[in-house]
Amino acid sequence: MIHSRRWAAAAAALALLLTGCSSAPGAPALGAGRSEIIVQAGEDEIPGLQSTAEEYTRDTGVDVRFVQREINAQAISNFISQSPTGQAPDIIVSPHDNLGQLAANGVVAPVELGDSGEDFTKNAQDAVKYNGVSYGVPYGVESVALVRNNELTTAEPSTFDDLRADGHRVMKEQGVSYPFTVSQDPDAGDPYHLYPLQTSFGAEVFKREKSGEYTDELAMGGEQGHQFAEYLADLGKSGDLRTSMTPDIAKESFIKGDSPYHIAGPWDVAEIEEAGMDVTVLPVPPAGPEEARPFAGVRAFFVNANAQNPVAAQDFAANYLTRADAQDSLYESTGRPPASKTAIENISDDPLRTSYAEIATTALPMPAIPAMGAVWSFWGTAENGIVEGDGAPVELWDQMIANIEGQIQ
């Protein structure tokens, strides 16, 4: 999701790289016999892959060619249908939350990382596992954090109530409009951005095995969920949380100095920097008694189970994309906080993204299980209803739980 405008060099390099894409004149069909591998990646990722691809070709004689395509539901559907026919790329880049669907359809192959896997943060390693099997090479981890406008406040709130109190102080003393801003959606809600507050009450979305993998049993019901629902209702009643605050309104209000705090992911950093703001990135403080843990979205490389050049695809993924220089290069081209511990150390001169990367190490991987598809709509609608005061918070929450469980069954 990170904006690529800041990375101007990537755009210039891309024009050269695309001469090797399958869409270029004379490029071979994906299913043709070849001494090459095809990698499908996004516009901001291809420049960061080029040097690693060139090194691989020098070492092995196997060419690495790129297909530029942004990952969305249609791209995943196409990969699933084309993989068995030999028409899909050998490697794709995707958010990890598509892994459950890919693995269930048998279109991705396990990737053995060996010792190099230890350089990745634990949650990045966990995110690319499905049923105990590792399927991917992570490179970026994104989660939300608290961005503070240092010109309005230098407080470091230890609880979310402290944040609200400081936000109201700034509103009174400096005339800003909001105590904090956070992305919402008037129609669908936004449980993603509110998840750190929810987990601080101990109400994770699904229960997890000892290994950390998710089961399809909901964990956000019961007393912990009720406490979060009551807190949401209070946020809505006070006017601190507004369902009308769209992503653009939240970001623009913070950038123009109308809020001292902003809950957002690293995709907003480039515009904040362009505005010349003096900001600090902090963990979201807890609203409840436990640590506030946001979702982590892990960007990773996955190998086609039906790759036309499976040995080379596995070799490139496990032995080249895991290298420190490859991970550094991907950070430079995409701006995504790294999944590699070494790469995190190497960006110490970028304090904002370093903070995001460090905060993301404690984030919870977004569930990649199929049951997650039953959650979002009911979850967001229920949260909106609670914030808007459409009913008793506990009753609305319990109805949401019943609706989701009905869908999962």
Regions found by a protein language model. Give the residues of each.
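Conserved N-terminal structural module of periplasmic/extracytoplasmic solute-binding proteins
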Residues: 2-98, 288, 403-409
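A structural signal for short loop-to-beta-strand junctions that line the ligand-binding cleft
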Residues: 80-81, 88-90, 117-151, 291-292, ...
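Hinge/lid segment of periplasmic solute-binding proteins
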Residues: 96-143, 162, 281-282
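Long, aromatic- and glycine/proline-rich binding clefts that accommodate carbohydrate-like moieties
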Residues: 128, 330-381
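Extracytoplasmic/periplasmic solute-binding protein
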Residues: 135-139, 144, 164-217, 259
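Glycine-centered hinge/linker elements that transmit conformational signals in sensory
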Residues: 212-244
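Extracytoplasmic/periplasmic substrate-recognition and gating elements
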Residues: 273-333
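Conserved C-terminal helix/tail region of periplasmic/extracytoplasmic solute-binding proteins
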Residues: 361-409
